[in-house]
Amino acid sequence: MKLTKGKINELLTQPGCEHNHNKEGQGKNKSCTQQAQPGSAQGGCAFDGASIALVPITDAAHLVHGSIACSGNSWNSRGSLSSGPMTYKMGFTTDLSENDVIFGGEKKLYQAIAQLVKRYHPAAVFVYSTCVTALIGDDLDAVCKAATKKYETPIIPVHAPGFVGSKNLGNRLGGEALLDHVVGTREPEFTTDFDINLIGEYNVAGEMWGVLPLFEKLGIRVLAKITGDARYEEVCYAHRAKLNLMICSKALINMATAMQERYGIPYIEESFYGIADMNRCLRNIAEYFGDAALKERVEQLIEEETTKLDLALAPYRERLKGKRVVLYTGGVKSWSVVSAAQDLGMEVVATSTKKSTEEDKAKIRELLGKDGIMLEKGSPTELLRVVEQTKADLLVAGGRNQYTALKARIPFLDINQERHHPYAGYVGMIEMARELDEAVHSPIWRLVRQPSPWDIWQQEHESLLNLEAE
């Protein structure tokens, strides 16, 4: 794939993304095709986006062709877990020096690939370009092609230098690498009538493991996971699925639309967070396949799981009812976590629209109602203002906002990719309720909100002086 201005515009203009236009491709929004403005890569560049989209392929090696900082500063930032191979946990880099920048890094890249393949025997090697190697003009395609032929191992170039744009664009560039070099290159041993792919699910904190057993009970086979806890081979035969389940549409919508065009695989956008959304997801899958027996199994499973959940969540609902929440996250979580909190009787008073599509925003408006606040930007000052204005009891956000909550002396729950607790599916709902309850009712908040001893002493001293003066 040649990374040209036209290709970037194509990735930024997706027919399935209602922020660009509706699903029929009408009403194109030209602003979506503009190149990245200075500063747009803050908080995650295109290289970072491509790597976090592809690194969860667990039996592949991931080689960063660039300076040591590109690999070191971003490695393992997303807590995607594996049920098998741990190759993806090892970071590989060509560690370019000044001499390599001057004379070119292609020879060093080839040597790095050779050493990696001989020593670790990965199922495949993904090679990531970075700002430096893109600027000096190293030919990744030629090196990867030669190495593939020599070592009979798929060596896949990923053209996502950081300067081309934001993390979201990098996600899509990672998806393009899969479409160009991986998907459709192998065939599964067999297929079933209910084969699906999960796209945009990264198994953060192992939360996908709470959802897969549900599909197994229903007789639905997850043919390929793109890319959480995935094996390289399963991504190769993902083109034989009957339905794509899009979990994070902002990130890999290009994969869903391209697979629909090339292989005729339709897609639906769903969420695994919250009882209502999980129920809706299972029902929509059954509705798509149109199988009466599957629909019956889905309804039976929903009844069983919701009955167990009602019992498990009863004490948490009683303790969390009426608590006010400010939610600051991005993408699908900006509305799906709202639904999960409302299932627990909590009131979400504000949420962010960072990285949200127009369809996401419509869902947020429906969930929050007319009084809900939608945050376009969430600087610490703005978040503190909203917390004070809404009298919020809790801030649910990413780890970088933890100190904002501490300043406001309110409880905080980490909801982003750095977290260590799974919140997806029915089991994840119980875990989320437990974490919310522990955060809100921790005794520390009663203590930190008390006046300091010296303030108490000062007040008592002033009161004593006033009495003496009288």
UniProtKB/Swiss-Prot annotation:
The keyword Zinc does not apply. One of its GO terms (biological process) is protein-containing complex assembly. SUPFAM superfamilies: Helical backbone' metal receptor (SSF53807). Keywords: Nitrogen fixation. InterPro entries: Nase/OxRdtase_comp1, Nase_comp1_CS, NifE, NifE-like. Pathway: Cofactor biosynthesis; Fe-Mo cofactor biosynthesis. Pfam families: Oxidored_nitro (PF00148). Residues 11-35 are annotated as: Disordered. Residues 18-27 have a biased composition (Basic and acidic residues). This protein may play a role in the biosynthesis of the prosthetic group of nitrogenase (FeMo cofactor). PANTHER family: NITROGENASE IRON-MOLYBDENUM COFACTOR BIOSYNTHESIS PROTEIN NIFE (PTHR42956:SF1). Belongs to the NifD/NifK/NifE/NifN family. This is Nitrogenase iron-molybdenum cofactor biosynthesis protein NifE. It comes from Rippkaea orientalis (strain PCC 8801 / RF-1).
